Regions:
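Residue-level marker of beta-strand positions
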Residues: 143-144
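N-terminal leader/capping segments at the start of a protein or of a new domain
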Residues: 1-58
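Double-stranded beta-helix
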Residues: 8, 12-13, 17-22, 100-101, ...
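Non-heme Fe(II)/2-oxoglutarate
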Residues: 47-61, 66-72, 170-177
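Ligand-binding loop in jelly-roll beta-barrel domains
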Residues: 71-75, 82, 129, 136-140, ...
């Protein structure tokens, strides 16, 4: 089982000095049995976001929705993707997380989906295949994929977990995307 993720949050105190507001080990959670395990690190409701106060938008480390919950918002999370042979895809999972899917793409890979976001997908550990309608590429630690609202899926063809960092930023839907 994947380990917890350490999250350190900073702030400004009453004297105007920077300090550490919290330093916690966030639990990880699967949104569905056999699905990737996620730790939600932070979410914003819009841009610009407020840095005032000490409110924690994700105190339990769980962000269930893939796109930001608020127009103009953002999400950052760490996701541990198990090898494909251990992954039990639930067709309702993507729909429950507000992802778009199509039957023809699901036939290529059951995790094919798209969201109205710009995603920065960073491979931290392991290897993961990024699948698109036309083509695929292997990502290794340090590789970054800029996913711009396109249909895609993640395929872990290896024997160990692939740890990914995702930053999702709300975006306008693509007009010519079928």
């Amino acid at each position: 089982m994947p380990g917890k993720v350490r999250r350190i949050v900073t702030g400004v105190n009453a004297a105007g000095r920077s300090y550490i507001v919290s330093d916690t080990q966030l639990p990880t959670a699967a949104v569905a049995p056999g699905a990737p395990v996620r730790a939600g690190l932070w979410t914003t409701e819009g841009a610009p976001s407020s840095n005032k106060g000490t409110h924690d938008p994700v105190p339990d480390g769980v962000i269930l929705y893939t796109p930001p919950a608020h127009r103009g918002g953002s999400v950052i999370r760490v996701t541990d993707i198990v090898p494909d042979k251990q992954h039990a895809y639930d067709p309702e999972d993507l729909k429950n997380r507000r992802c778009k899917t199509t039957p023809d793409r699901s036939a290529k890979h059951p995790g094919f989906h798209c969201t109205d976001t710009v995603d920065y997908a960073i491979c931290l550990e392991g290897e993961i295949w990024a699948l698109l309608d036309e083509g695929e590429t292997l990502m290794r630690p340090g590789d970054v994929l800029i996913q711009r609202g396109t249909y895609h899926a993640w395929s872990n063809r290896g024997d160990r977990i692939a740890r990914m960092l995702f930053v999702l930023i709300d975006a306008e839907p693509l007009d010519n995307h079928r």
